Amino acid sequence: MKRSLGSNSSNNSGSGSNKKSKKNNNPSNQKTLGAAWGAASSRSSFRSSPFSDFGSYMEVKNRKLQNQFETEASAASRGVSGSEKLIFQGVSIFVDGFTIPSHQELKGYMMKYGGRFENYFSRRSVTHIICSNLPDSKVKNLRTFSRGLPVVKPTWIVDSISANRLLGWVPYQLDQLNDTQPKLSAFFAPRSHLTPQMASPVTSFQPDTGYSEAEEGSSIRADDSEEARDHIDDEIDGVYIENTTPELTEQTGTGDLKSSEMNAEGLGNYDIEEKEVSSELQSTTNLHSTSDNKSVHANGKNGGKSIATAAGSSTRRHSTLEDPNFVENYFKNSRLHFIGTWRNRYRKRFHGSSNGLKWADSGQNTAEMAKKSTIIHIDLDCFFVSVVIKNRLELHDKPVAVCHSDNPKGTAEISSANYPARAYGVKAGMFVRHAKDLCPQLVIVPYNFEAYEEVADQFYDILHRHCRKVQALSCDEAFLDVSDLSDVETEVLASTIRNEILETTGCSASAGIGGTMLMARLATRVAKPAGQLYISAEKVEEFLDQLPVGTLPGVGSVLKEKLVKQNIQTCGQLRLISKDSLQKDFGVKTGEMLWSYSRGLDLRSVTAVQESKSIGAEVNWGVRFRDQQDVFILVQHFLQCLCKEVSLRLQGCEMIGRTFTLKIKKRKKDAEEPTKYMGCGDCDNLSRSITVPAATDDIEVLQRISKKLFGSFCLDVKEVRGVGLQVSKLDSADPSNKGSRTLKSWLSSAPAVVQIEQDDNVFAAKVRENSDCNRPVTGGVSRLRESNSEESSIQSGDTNSSLPPMCYLDMEVLENLPPELLSELDGTYGGKLFELIEKKRGKRRINCNSPHVSLDGTAASIKELKSLSVKIHGLSTSGEKEYKEPYVPHPSIARTSNQHTIEMTDLLPSSLSQVDVSVLQELPEELRADVLGAFPSHRRQQSSSDVPKETCKKQDEEPIDLKGTENEIGLSFSSLWFGNPPLWTEKFKVSGNCTMEKLSAIYFKVAQSRPMLSLVLQHAISEMSSFPDAASASDLDKAIYDVCELLKQYINLKVGGDIEEIYLCFRLLKRLAARSQLFLQVYEILSPFIQASISEHYGGSLSIP
């Protein structure tokens, strides 16, 4: 009977009769969640099975799996002690999706420690759902998905095993409010998506930049004041810490906190700190990093493994991946950036308040001055905390710290802590989670940069009222040289200043007084908080005897360890070592420093704020790029924003620079993820520099240089973790002569610009009246300017006042000058030079195309001459981006000109292959565009002599937009790809060249709907078995030129957004070059051009195998 039910005939006969009844009975047969998949099946295979329906099959399967699990669990638990067997008793988990630990590992844990593992979800048997990430559909319907069960991360299992007890699942629940699933639109977003509107709003808690002070350049002083403070004061408030700069840390730390690129690569299964990310990222547009490699390595490598919860918002929105304003926000919310910008404001505000800030007497010995000097060191106590809580009396006696996040399990870093917090061991640079462990009642407050700025200004107003010699170290710390204030007691003055600061700002300050800057600062350390200490010269040795060597400026952890190995722990012990021994063991400079500081000697004097030796900016937090496609959009946008920031800093300091250094942090091979969220981690530091002839702060120059340097690294952008740009070899930028030192300004300068007079006859007559060379021209062109004030406007300068008389000029030299230079000289002489030349020639008439003017000075010739002068100088004088090229005669016309005619085309190369690309790249953009624009005109004139003169003039007069077409070449062929079909197809069709006609026909055949040149070239290879050469050399030259123009314009159209198309075209062109002499020459001519275009746009070269 069973065989007959399973036969084919039985299947066919019974399948149709029971279809409707089975559909009606489906819902009543469902017994598990998975039963719905197959309960409605009408296939006869289920009718022939021992199960009544799919639901019964699943019920039996689940029972079998549970039996297998219990058997394996019994065997696995034999080696486990009794106390460990029942950790997960009563817990039944269902694993959804990819997790770490894996599905099988979690199953093993349940077997070993008394839990149950469900292969199929059932609300009746499952107690916890384990997952790391959820798709968008489940996030939106979380209640439906979980059926009210807790959804927790797998770290709950791991941590419970580590603790040998069942931990509460609440801290580990997956509270994923937004999906992390990439959107399809993100992969096809145009360049226009990089708009400021995409930036997230900044709310109350602001991030800290924490970029390296050494890299800051313009913001942070280059001397050792920060380093000294770092090692002198163990209770420092985090303002100048080099090794623990705030907010992001750790280039060597590891952990399992996932960074954004891991999610982007589909590895987002690590246990990212959800509440930390939600707290730190939702409250700000971005976070910031330090650039030091050692700041939190001591915090442990696995500190983040027990942290659970997932990001409340997409982490990529707070990195370079999707935040177009990332760089701007990075520095906007930076504490160190605030200090740097404040220093610039201070320099401008108090400039000249202390006699130009130059106090040292150059005729007096520095050592002699140090002996009789008295220095006060003033430092506000816990500045960044005190300013925030000064109006919050309830927090004055409580432990408080400044940070961007108060998440107790976060990796945000403490920037500054008050003294009650420091009593618990809380220090600057410490993770919030570690600080909360030491001090659970720690109160976290956000930054208030406006209040900081106000208090800092009040602080320095008070200092400058009481002392003339003030050296600002930061917004809250300064040295005062009161050696010349003999009418007031030093200690009384310090006390008066401190009391006035407290009354005005509401913040306490500490003061140290000593004979040197070193002793004053050491005294402040002892006086803190809210006190003052005076160390007289007689008490210096006594004070230093028991002072640990680690508190001396410049003694870091490495140097301190070396000293301890030699049993040198105090300054008293250090004084027993001779200078020669110290210099032998630690080097000349370090040995000199140790010997001097151990005796309280310090030859430094209080001076003004020193000019920065370098200015730059570095970003090494949140830098993540997906793949090579980001090079063309996100990387370039990032570099543009970074160059904008550096340019603004240069302009703020009124400096320009010549050497540009691009620094890259590249993730080390096999480096683990950093403990700090979105940190740079363990990196290799790479850098390359370039020096330009003329100093500049122009943002376009910086962008071009940075793109070129970045391309020279040849990096996988996925490995980039930090980028910095530094400008050195600085020079002062005089605002009144800004731009006068640039090559562009020198080339475009015109001492005289002649305005076209409506009545040219009157102008010509007046020029003839003033062209007499019998009387010397004294006093420059002043009289010329007076006589021609109505007809011409002449820009005078120092050069004009020393011009030689025209009668002293060598006419033979003048006649052989280039037309542009000759026109410029003519303008300098008020338009009289051309007439003088003609008079010397005996009043000979010359062709109107010549750059000279006839003696009788007809209106037409003068008008053309003046038009030429305006065209030559129009770019520099009008300030417009569009200009007209001067008319250059056609070669055929030039041959008929007078022998004195000077053609500009004589100065141009015969082909672009003769141009040095490296030199071309170093030219300013306007000059480079001018050179590239002139070259095709020259080629066109040589190869198309049959073009009418009127056509040439019309084409030459068409303006070129330098801004819109940065690499635009050709003056009259810019429309070959205009229209549908493009104009070149008609031109090629009637060219008379077989190859060109065939290309036109192929376009209409295959590419009319998709105007892609690669389609035309691809079909040309397959359809054209042979390529007949032109009948004559001139025809071949003309065809080569026309095809070159077609490809050049196509490159200009595509190079900015479709480099793949250009690559494909030149691969195909190289194949065509093997078959045709025409395409071979085209390929050789265009190869340097394409490489120059690629280098200009992307900073590299295009490899064409």
From Swiss-Prot:
What PANTHER family does the record tag this protein with?
A: DNA REPAIR PROTEIN REV1
Show the GO cellular component annotation of the record: nucleus
Q: How is the cofactor bound?
A: Mn(2+) ions. Can also use Mg(2+) ions with a lower efficiency.
The top of its lineage is:
Eukaryota, Viridiplantae, Streptophyta, Embryophyta, Tracheophyta
Q: Where is this site: Substrate discrimination?
A: 384
Q: Where is the BRCT domain?
A: 83-174
The family line of this record is: Belongs to the DNA polymerase type-Y family.
Which protein, by its recorded name, is this?
DNA repair protein REV1
Pfam families the record matches? BRCT, IMS, IMS_C, IMS_HHH_1
